[in-house]
Amino acid sequence: KAIADYKASKYQDDINEINSQIEQIKFYNGFTAVRGPGIMVRVSDNISEDPELDIMERIVHDVDIVVLLNDLKAAGAEAIEVNGKRIINISEVVCAGPLIRVNGEVIPAPFVIIAIGDMDELYDAVTEEGTYAYELKNTYGMEVVAAQGYNLTVREFRGINYETKYAEIVKEGEK
């Protein structure tokens, strides 16, 4: 028993370090829920009854959400979700008729985006004159409402089973 205890304690530091690295990798890749300061942005369709306004100009499109997400990333967002769907490197935001598909699930408007990061930087990225969100609101009449929060939560990624067909891991030393 003493030998087994010795071996277990000898490797415990290595095991703890590996577990710590796994948790860090999960965090950086969106596989853990996170909490912190940031903003919540609600984006929804133009509700104007103006018959002159084309229906395609009255609805929020996938590209609108993609541009908003990119603006938030550029402003330093550390974690983002749209209607509860965590945005990670393999997330897709694509048109699905009057809806959008995120991580393989179809979601309707209104679109609620939560981004964690510097509240002021993120808020400015969606409210200042000249930003895409400002244009959506003031040129196209979309509802774009942003609010800051000190204790927002972005859920962990739960989505599609991503399968690689072409990419292979390059081992260290290989070219």
Residue ranges and their predicted role:
Residues D120-K175:
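Extracytoplasmic/luminal low-complexity segments enriched in Pro/Gly and acidic/polar residues
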Residues I47-Y134:
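Soluble extracytoplasmic domains of inner/organellar membrane proteins
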Residues K1-R42:
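Juxtamembrane "stalk/linker" segments
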Residues Y28-F31, R101-N103, M142-E143:
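A generic local secondary-structure boundary/capping motif
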Residues R42, I114, T153-R155:
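Residues in well-ordered beta-strands of folded domains
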Residues K26, D45-I47, R86, R158:
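Short, well-ordered turn and helix-capping elements at secondary-structure junctions
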Residues K10, A33, M56-D64, A146:
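Extracytoplasmic/periplasmic, Sec-exported soluble proteins
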Residues S20, V34-G38, A75, V82, ...:
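Extracytoplasmic
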